[in-house]
A protein has these predicted regions:
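Catalytic core segments in nucleotide and nucleic-acid processing enzymes
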Residues: 1-96
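Aromatic-enriched hydrophobic runs in primary sequence
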Residues: 14-15, 19, 37, 121, ...
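Non-catalytic C-terminal interaction segments of nucleic acid-processing enzymes
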Residues: 52-166
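C-terminal engagement modules used by replication, chromatin/transcription, nuclear envelope/ESCRT
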Residues: 160-183
């Protein structure tokens, strides 16, 4: 396949400085292209602090964003944009996000199953913490960590769970609203 021309970094520098002027050095510089970058391109990217990513890796990131609109935190993603080839770093970030989504989906299903089994309309945090321990959790969570995720899932922005707030966080009650599909 084709590779990115060696002079791509120099062209990006020249055009970027012309259009962005004093903002150029603070801006994120990214080259998207096919194949492996040449040795010279990698060296230029390191010197000019330009990240290089394959189109397929970018596509995975875009598909994740399309499927789970709120899942990608741009400030967090920016930490993965290092000078040079960054496909491994971006794939690491995608895997981290997918793991977080699976955990949240598991917790939503836990609430749903708990309410089905108990016949209750909602469940107290303490009961959900115990249920989580016995539900083959994908990762260990402290009670407060589980509570924080329950809060996130009950936010009006996500709307997967509902919440009845009490005077103590351990007494807050949660109920199921909708699934978070994963595949």
């Amino acid at each position: 396949g084709k590779s990115i021309p060696d002079r791509a970094v120099e062209e990006l520098d020249r055009i970027g400085k012309r259009h962005l002027q004093e903002n150029y050095l603070q801006s994120v510089r990214l080259i998207i292209g096919p194949g492996e970058p040449t040795k010279n391109l990698k060296q230029s990217a390191q010197i000019s602090k330009v990240s290089i990513i394959k189109a397929m890796t970018l596509q995975k990131l875009v598909e994740l964003k399309a499927k789970y609109p709120g899942a990608i935190n741009l400030l967090e993603l920016k930490q993965y944009l290092e000078p040079g080839q960054i496909d491994d770093k971006i794939n690491e970030y995608i895997a981290k996000i997918e793991k977080e989504i699976k955990l949240r989906s598991h917790i939503i299903q836990l609430v749903k199953r708990h309410l089905e089994k108990t016949g209750a309309k909602d469940a107290q945090v303490g009961n959900l913490c115990i249920a989580y321990l016995y539900d083959h959790p994908p990762q260990n969570l402290k009670d407060k960590e589980l509570y924080d995720i329950l809060i996130e899932l009950s936010s009006p922005l996500t709307g997967y769970l509902g919440r009845t707030k009490e005077d103590d966080w351990k007494k807050d009650r949660f109920y199921y609203l909708r699934d978070l599909p994963i595949n």
